[in-house]
């Protein structure tokens, strides 16, 4: 009976987000706005009116696309906060617009796209000149992107 069971594809069950009361959110923190993981860049609260609660006005920048999102919610309501992980990987190659990254476990991942714009150009330039660099990869809500580079410690 136990031979037919296959548990390899299960994940740890960790949620992509966790709830936090609107009034507990802070500037430079993270929040999900319009379904996107955002960094809070501006936050203001309005006073309690005759009817209802104090409102919190949030402005956030999408951590992957850089687009600006806004939302207003009562201060007592819960908002989703994305679980964000930052990992550094050693760059060992670039092929067809994808990065080859060496993980701590010794495995190589080749599923991460070379970022567009200045960061992508800088990564290519440093790789072509033979520099050993670490790529900082940000993951949140099933998305991942290379967001920064730094020289490897010798």
UniProtKB/Swiss-Prot annotation:
Query: Where located?
Result: Cytoplasm; Nucleus; Endoplasmic reticulum membrane
Which UniProt key words apply to this protein? Acetylation, Cytoplasm, Elongation factor, Endoplasmic reticulum, Hypusine, Membrane, Nucleus, Protein biosynthesis, RNA-binding
The residue range of the signal peptide is: none
Q: Which GO terms describe its biological process?
A: positive regulation of translation; positive regulation of translational elongation; positive regulation of translational termination; translational elongation
- CDD domains in the record, alphabetically? S1_eIF5A
> PTM Hypusine: at which residues?
50
Where, per the database record, does this protein carry N6-acetyllysine? Answer: 47, 121
Q: Quote the Gene3D superfamilies the UniProt record gives.
A: 2.30.30.30, Nucleic acid-binding proteins
A GO cellular-component term linked to this record: endoplasmic reticulum membrane
Q: Which family does it belong to?
A: Belongs to the eIF-5A family.
PANTHER family hit by this protein: TRANSLATION INITIATION FACTOR 5A FAMILY MEMBER (PTHR11673)
* Official protein name in the record: Eukaryotic translation initiation factor 5A-1
Q: Which organism is it from?
A: Oryctolagus cuniculus
Q: What is the lineage of its organism?
A: Eukaryota, Metazoa, Chordata, Craniata, Vertebrata
């Amino acid at each position: 009976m136990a031979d037919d069971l296959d548990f390899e594809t299960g994940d740890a069950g960790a949620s992509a987000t966790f709830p936090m009361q609107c009034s507990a959110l802070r500037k430079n923190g993270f929040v999900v706005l319009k379904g996107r993981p955002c960094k809070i860049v501006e936050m203001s609260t309005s006073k309690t009116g005759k009817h209802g609660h104090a409102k919190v006005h949030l402005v956030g920048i999408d951590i992957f696309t850089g687009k600006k999102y806004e939302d207003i919610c009562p201060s007592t309501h819960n908002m989703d906060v994305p679980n964000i992980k930052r990992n550094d990987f050693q760059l060992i190659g670039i092929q067809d617009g994808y990065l080859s990254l060496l993980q701590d476990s010794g495995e190589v991942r080749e599923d991460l796209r070379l970022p567009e714009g200045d960061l992508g150009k800088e990564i290519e330039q440093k790789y072509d000149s033979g520099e050993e660099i670490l790529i900082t990869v940000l993951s949140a809500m099933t998305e991942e992107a290379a967001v920064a580079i730094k020289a490897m410690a010798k």
